[in-house]
Amino acid sequence: KIYLTNSLEEYHPDTGTLFANWLSAEANEANHIKRDTPVMVVVGNPPYAVSSTNKGAWIQNLIADYKKDLNEKKLNLDDDYIKFIRYGQHYIDKNGCGILAYISNNSFIDGITHRQMRRRLLESFDKIYVVDLHGNAKIQEICSDGSVDQNVFDIMQGVSINIFIKTLLKKKTELGQVFHHSLQGKREFKYDQLNTSGIESINWEKLKCTDPGYFFVQKDFKEIEKYETFFRLHDLFLISGPGCKTERDGLNIKFTKEELRTVLLDFINLSEEEIRSKYNLHKDSRDWKVKWAKNDVIANFSNTIIQSYLYRPFDVRYIYYSGISKGFVGTPGYKRFYNMLNDNIGIIFPRICKGNNGFQHGFISRNIIDVAAGDAFSGAGTFFAPLYRYPDKSESLIVEQNIERQHNLNVELINQVAGRIGLTFNIDDLSYGLEDITSKLTFTPIDILDYIYAILYSPTYREKYKEFLKIDFPRVPYPKDQRTFWQLVQLGGDLRQIHLMESPILNMLITKYPVVGSNEVDKVRFETYDYEATLLNENGEFDYPDYLGAVYINDTQYFADVPTSAWEFYIGGYQPAQKWLKDRKGRKLGMQDILQSQYTPFA
């Protein structure tokens, strides 16, 4: 018999007066099941809802077990599917043995904030079987051979089939065993595999689930001892944190100061109703309301409050920045970004990285940055650390030059670096390191930044430590000697200047813009020139060089001689050369825009 009830609510001792007679009888029967009936099997496809409305005390108390000792600001553990896993675990634990079997959101099998959840499941169950069905369109998931990977449902979130088995055989002090199977490809292929397979016939991979992650996917941690001797990038900086989150990007971020100023004047002069109508702002959110935004602009607007803003790699736009939380900008990150209102520079790095391409992260900025400036997929956002700190002398945010500043580095870590390479850290040198570095006996804050930047872009580093770079802030090796340190400082400094569009080498343009026209971006496309493959060796293998092509912005105008590698290059999940142009569809490129489009492939 089937009863209508809310599974995530505890049984009610008295329901007879709450409902009509027929519903009261059904509720009482359901309460009897919840309270007295042993549950040996829980099966289902629980709902996925990050903003869960199921916030009853009973399930919130149960789910708290998954949140203990995480030391995370954002937990992401209140999704309904997680509550249903905890609900099922509760009833199987209560019975002493049984089976919990769900097809669900698969984020819990390798999520960083889910590590205590996985540990609790390992403590409860003897064996856990996970068929990872992948299909996560949010991170553009593909198969290992580059072919398409489809979801088994018409959703974007990846899914997995999870079977948790509890017997009375496992000791309480032991952790359960995890068996994993990965299934990728087209939807029909996955259906066929699932329809013709049983738990006994699947080729399971037994995982070694260990502290601190307890991952339910295969991880290659053979380099862990060496990697853990490196310093954690997040620990190097005294001040760091996520990028700025506007809550209304289309409204708050503009390509020109004039466009932004028009919006701000509307917020001053128009009523709330007129603002909502003109800018299609029908629904407020928790951190952004038209009333709050209007009050902020009226109280603080001035020309100096319009700031340059790194929205995406190489894409600098403009933002209104008063530093007021829940104002025109929802989450401005004032403690970090007031330091960027004067002359400064900062490094961008991820907390975790998802997607198919592994760690392709790291960027640099002289401006306030967006929460997604350095990562397209993670959901954890982009972290930013300014190199220098300024005294917070004014809440007016009026930019002043020559204000005294100091570095933003952990001196204890810096002293360890200095001791290893026999150099002295010059705490008073706050320059940007443009002088000759080959004969220096001291190093400066910018040298440390450049050293780190070179490491983050090292192909060897990215490949060797790719599993670790997926799950936490990057760790950076201590330099082994002066010679290596200065070599990497030089490489990192050159790359920094190129990425900031400050290097004179950018004037050596590698592309052309040969056709005069409207300069309006319409349909952006890349057409490779007609090449023949070059025979590489006697085995008949072919070498496909870095072909050049033309990037068309409309039917007639194009950028010529763009390398394929530059067009397809990734930074943080973005392809900057493509995204910069595609984001300007419908706009006319000015001279500076045309130069930017030619600089970006080189950078």
PLM features: residue spans?
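Asp/Glu-centered strand-loop micro-motifs enriched in Gly/Pro and often flanked by an aromatic residue
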Residues: 27-32, 73-75, 439-440
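Glycine-rich S-adenosyl-L-methionine
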Residues: 66-91
